[in-house]
Amino acid sequence: MARDFPLERVRNIGIAAHIDAGKTTTTERILFYSGVVHKIGEVHDGAAVTDWMAQERERGITITAAAISTSWQDHRINIIDTPGHVDFTIEVERSMRVLDGVIAVFCAVGGVQPQSETVWRQADRYSVPRMVFVNKMDRTGADFLKVHGQIKDRLKANAVPIQLPIGAEGELSGIIDLVANKAYIYKNDLGTDIEEADVPADMADEVAEWRNTLMETVAETDEALIEKFLESGELSVDDLKKGIREGVLKHGLVPMLCGSAFKNKGVQLVLDAVIDYLPAPVDVPPIQGVLPDGSEAVRPSDDSAPFSALAFKVMADPYGKLTFVRMYSGILEKGSYVLNSTKGEKERISRLVVLKADDREEVDALRAGDLGAVLGLKNTTTGDTLCTQDDPIVLETLFIPEPVISVAVEPKTKGDMEKLSKALVALAEEDPTFRVNTDSETGQTVIAGMGELHLEILVDRMLREFKVEANIGAPQVSYRETIRGSAGGEGKFSRQTGGKGQYGHVVIEMEPGEPGSGFEFVNKIVGGVVPKEYIKPAEQGMKETCESGVIAGYPLIDVKCTLVHGSYHDVDSSEMAFKIAGSMAFKDGVKKCNPVLLEPMMKVEVEAPEDFLGSIIGDLSSRRGQVEGQSVEDGTSKISAKVPLAEMFGYATELRSMTQGRGIFSMEFDNYAEVPRNVAEAIISKNQGNS
């Protein structure tokens, strides 16, 4: 079966931004103008096509990355609409991993906001080419050029306008295309009657100036264009388009467009720009992976190459488990068997679908460059590689952030117990930032996630989708332990009970590890003082103790343990004895290494009328916050601060009452920092049951 669209005419793009910048509305308009839907769905009415979970429609926010296929000007466009709330950052992360290009949506009033920076960093991490759509140009206070300045200053991007708005706020009537040097005037509310006209006389000077800036910026991307521009002082429309595309693909240029998705202005021009400037799968470097022998290899975006794909999302579905895949090379056919090379297991492909939000179309095959979903995979989870059994490869996987907040969940009845465990398994399969564990002392089930809203949504889904009745505990902070010093540790486990005894003895040296290294073990035993078969159990004992913590019961991070000495008994030594000795040595070492408690620090941004500035700063300081910056613009104050997560519970309510409901804030995880001694002592004491 031949391709519907050649690879050069395929675009895999994401729409990403800060919450409320208008991503989902932009996606809805794209679907309307490209003919996927025949009626416009509004987010605030709960009718958006890409917001199809009950919670999304109620809250007016996008939680999961919905994948949709559409077409425009004889091109296939696969779109992922990603959430803007930081609690769902994994959805953005996994989208970025499988996309070729991104439309970053900014609010013309709010400009560069905290989550915009997070999304931009995620796109940087995966080297995704991008363009900018400055949305909400119809809103009071909209300022396209102010946003341009913020993108250059705060995101350090070489942003260049390729459009200018005609009017702003309530007067937005059209858009100037600086490339074609034409004006597009919107004649009806639906945005379907557009008149092409000359640039308005009162904007001629401004347009000439910005068009010249565009030509200069584009000329710098290519030596041949520089020569042309210096000779004639002009670049043709084709030269400009070619230069902008080259600049975008090389990450040297970010074209900026403008409009109002809600008022149906500018969206068709965004679609044109996606085709003109964002890459096809063949324009981006081939995906890299590792072969079974450990050597690196690439898979070109080509149907004739060996099949390889990355599972980037798993979702429970009424018809079975849906696994979303990005096809990188080769062809995947219905009914075939493939290898999950990450887990070393064979999987059968029972059905293949492409999606239009909660609508689906069955297909016989997926090809290189496609985004689609597979039904029937048993053991594949997010980040796994699927490939041909004859030519195995493991592709680069996803970066998965650690959860920072947890709550205890208790089923109300025995019947709910079974439903709860099924629900937790299904939800954890879908969302790698959602962790489930059992508290060894209390036996309670504890769930952890990226923030209060994240856990709230998951608990809500347990009730709705899995009909689990459960009591939910108060949120708890995910603290960590670490060490600041170096020392030796010794563990000797010796027990005689008449008959065969138990004996294990290890000596270790302990020191702080590299940041992000977790637990690192080095074996420096010489001369067989500890036999080979007991090294692994000793390491396991240390690792398990590391995971359960020493001073307050929280996982210990960034520690290096070197096994240097020990002793054994021919008869009494066993794996269990050395595992216990390893654990004892680890605890002994930690206590001598200046152990400290770490807590998650959040990057907090608050916006409120200027009158409340003093109260907000005072309140943040009382929460152990450090104010890092403040500004006042048009009567609105913006404060950025770093505050411990432990001090931020209930902040939304407090801010509302402090600002008479006129303050808003956003918060995202920044780093782990040492807890002040007096606060740490209280936490340790409470966890040891002394409070």
From Swiss-Prot:
Coiled coil location: none
Record-linked SUPFAM superfamilies: EF-G C-terminal domain-like, P-loop containing nucleoside triphosphate hydrolases, Ribosomal protein S5 domain 2-like, Translation proteins
Keyword GTP-binding among UniProt keywords: yes
Cross-referenced InterPro entries: EFG_II, EFG_III, EFG_III/V, EFG_IV, EFG_V, EFG_V-like, EFTu-like_2, G_TR_CS
GO function term, MF aspect, one: GTP binding
Binding, GTP: 17-24, 81-85, 135-138
Keywords: Cytoplasm, Elongation factor, GTP-binding, Nucleotide-binding, Protein biosynthesis
Domain tr-type G: 8-282
GO biological process: ribosome disassembly
Compartments, as annotated in UniProt: Cytoplasm
CDD domains: EF-G, EFG_III, EFG_mtEFG1_IV, EFG_mtEFG_C, EFG_mtEFG_II
Keyword Protein biosynthesis among UniProt keywords: yes
A GO-annotated cellular component: cytoplasm
Record PROSITE patterns: G_TR_1, G_TR_2
Source domain of life: Bacteria
Record family assignment: Belongs to the TRAFAC class translation factor GTPase superfamily. Classic translation factor GTPase family. EF-G/EF-2 subfamily.
PANTHER family xref list: RIBOSOME-RELEASING FACTOR 2, MITOCHONDRIAL (PTHR43261:SF1), TRANSLATION ELONGATION FACTOR G-RELATED (PTHR43261)
Function in brief: Catalyzes the GTP-dependent ribosomal translocation step during translation elongation. During this step, the ribosome changes from the pre-translocational (PRE) to the post-translocational (POST) state as the newly formed A-site-bound peptidyl-tRNA and P-site-bound deacylated tRNA move to the P and E sites, respectively. Catalyzes the coordinated movement of the two tRNA molecules, the mRNA and conformational changes in the ribosome.
Full protein name: Elongation factor G
Organism: Synechococcus sp. (strain CC9605)
Gene from which this protein is expressed: fusA
